[in-house]
Amino acid sequence: MELLEEDLTCPICCSLFDDPRVLPCSHNFCKKCLEGLLEGNVRNSLWRPSPFKCPTCRKETSATGVNSLQVNYSLKGIVEKYNKIKISPKMPVCKGHLGQPLNIFCVTDMQLICGICATRGEHTKHVFSSIEDAYAREKNAFESLFQSFETWRRGDALSRLDTLETNKRKALQLLTKDSDKVKEFFEKLQHTLDQKKNEILSDFETMKLAVMQTYDPEINKINTILQEQRMAFNIAEAFKDVSEPIIFLQQMQEFREKIKVIKETPLPHSNLPTSPLMKNFDTSQWGDIKLVDVDKLSLPQDTGVFTSKIPWYPYLLLMMVVLLGLLIFFGPTVFLEWSPLDELATWKDYLSSFNSYLTKSADFIEQSVFYWEQMTDGFFIFGERVKNVSLVALNNVAEFICKYKLL
């Protein structure tokens, strides 16, 4: 077909011939193509038209118009038949015999075959039919076959489809429910881990606070003593070159009193009586903890609070001093008749006695203050521990209530 199409193609427009005209040299061209060539030849000639030459062989022709050329009816008919063949569908060929058209219908096997299949193949003893007769019979058979196929097990198929979709939906719901359980489990586990981490870190912060409350007062006392010492040196530097006797003696007296006070001020102990914070603390020991026992993680039992080794009797002495002061202030009001002048005089005497007593007992008071600070620090740490234990207990109770839906 491709070779035939080349012979039916116009050399000028490269399309199939349309109303082909033949030149005296026997070459064929489309009528419209020749008209275009002749018009161009006339426009390019100023005085007299030049002879028309064949586009293929360049042979001159005496034709002055396309209408004077002969129509090639044979070629025109061939082109028309070629167009019809090209438009019509191609006949299928046999797969077993290359190039042989399937132009016979085997009634026995109900299929198209070629001539070789009918004469020398497996269909030799079968019943054959023409394509037209087979088409008429199969066209009628198609209607009944289509109707029976349309209702073939349709109800059963729809029922099974509905069952499969229902089972699929239930399976997805179960998987979603299980995945939600897994998500909830890990969310609770993460919450427990975060809670336990915050609890242990809170214990560390409490211990840090205890360290600062134990050491900071002593450090501040030493810094105060050093500052007083620097001030005394500054005073000495200021008056050591004074030549006025009175001023020098006055400054010397103040300097001597300052040095006396500094020397009489006791220095705090550098090694405070506290127990170690932790013994053999190692987080690698937590590697063997199971997930179910995560809530049981805790710091070693010998940690968390400074254990003071201060004896109990200084606290007793301090309490006695406090009670004595309360008795001095409030005793006359409670047990004696109230008189403004006598009351003021009595208060003055008591305060004078108490002031002299305190002046003579400076060391005792400083020791009492030291022990009092230790006692308040201990109460503060104890209160923090009680608060932490209470919060943990409340959280456990809340989780127990939520878990078993008691409310």
Swiss-Prot record:
Cited SUPFAM superfamilies: B-box zinc-binding domain, RING/U-box
Broad enzyme group: transferase
Transmembrane segments annotated in the record for this chain: 316-336
Record GO biological process: ERAD pathway; innate immune response; negative regulation of viral transcription; positive regulation of canonical NF-kappaB signal transduction; positive regulation of macroautophagy; proteasome-mediated ubiquitin-dependent protein catabolic process; protein autoubiquitination; suppression of viral release by host
Origin: domain of life: Eukaryota
Binding residues for Zn(2+): 94, 97, 117, 123
Substrates-to-products reaction catalysed: S-ubiquitinyl-[E2 ubiquitin-conjugating enzyme]-L-cysteine + [acceptor protein]-L-lysine = [E2 ubiquitin-conjugating enzyme]-L-cysteine + N(6)-ubiquitinyl-[acceptor protein]-L-lysine
Domain notes per entry: The coiled-coil domain is required for the induction of autophagy during endoplasmic reticulum (ER) stress. The RING-type zinc finger is required for auto-polyubiquitination.
Family designation: Belongs to the TRIM/RBCC family.
Subunit (UniProt): Interacts (via C-terminal domain) with VCP. Interacts with AKT1; the interaction ubiquitinates AKT1 and leads to its proteasomal degradation. Interacts with MDM2; the interaction ubiquitinates AKT1 and leads to its proteasomal degradation. Interacts with p62/SQSTM1. Interacts with TRAF6. Interacts with IKBKG/NEMO.
Native organism: Mus musculus (Mouse)
The enzyme's E.C. designation: 2.3.2.27
Disulphides: none
Chain ranges of zinc fingers (B box-type): 89-131
Coiled coil: 172-200
Keywords carried by this UniProt record: Coiled coil, Endoplasmic reticulum, Immunity, Innate immunity, Membrane, Metal-binding, Transferase, Transmembrane, Transmembrane helix, Ubl conjugation, Ubl conjugation pathway, Zinc, Zinc-finger
Subcellular localization: Endoplasmic reticulum membrane
Molecular-function GO term, any one: zinc ion binding
Gene designation: Trim13
Pathway(s) of this molecule: Protein modification; protein ubiquitination
Keyword tRNA processing appears in the UniProt entry: no
Post-translational modification: Auto-ubiquitinated; requires the RING-type zinc finger. Auto-polyubiquitination leads to proteasomal degradation.
GO cellular component: cytoplasm; endoplasmic reticulum membrane; perinuclear endoplasmic reticulum
Coiled coil listed as a keyword: yes
Alphabetized InterPro entries for the sequence: TRIM/RBCC, Znf-RING_euk, Znf_B-box, Znf_RING, Znf_RING/FYVE/PHD, Znf_RING_CS
A Pfam family annotated for this UniProt entry: zf-B_box
Name of the featured protein: E3 ubiquitin-protein ligase TRIM13
